[in-house]
């Protein structure tokens, strides 16, 4: 999934190639100093027909320490939503680290997550470290830091293609 120039003198060049060649002119000196040749944003369109996993992403400091990478702060823009579609973002009540672990282990973490019924045009800011998930019937534009680090904490006991429960973190 690469962004590629569609026409003109640079036709066929990927965004990565453009950044390597024209980094400072394209992104500015400060962005290149901080991110090097990595484009700092990733944009996804997510058409969720089922509830997606409950997850959380590390901040820059933790991601650097554990993965030598960037963390992930996100923003969701609701493009479309079925009637009654919901997102989860953050906790609905204060919980202790012990209660958090217990709820993850006994599959009740969703009971303490804040749910929001969504409508086209809604926007959600998800700072790194906030537990979140996209619900069934949601079509979301997700704008985020470029990072692949996701800690899946609950996945509704789904199985992968081999019949095994997907890995939780």
Model-derived features: where do they sit?
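Short, glycine/acidic-rich beta->alpha junctions
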Residues: 70, 110, 122, 126
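Residues that form generic nucleotide/phosphate-binding pockets
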Residues: 18, 22, 103, 112
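Transition-metal
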Residues: 1-95, 156-169
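Conserved metal-binding segment of the jelly-roll/cupin
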Residues: 54-57, 117-136, 145
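Short edge beta-strand segments in beta-sheet-rich domains
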Residues: 73, 135-138
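Short, well-ordered, mixed-charge alpha-helical segments that flank or form enzyme active sites
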Residues: 62-63, 84-89, 95-100, 127, ...
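Double-stranded beta-helix
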Residues: 88-111, 141-169
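Short helix-to-loop capping/linker segments positioned immediately adjacent to catalytic or ligand/cofactor-binding
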Residues: 65, 110-115
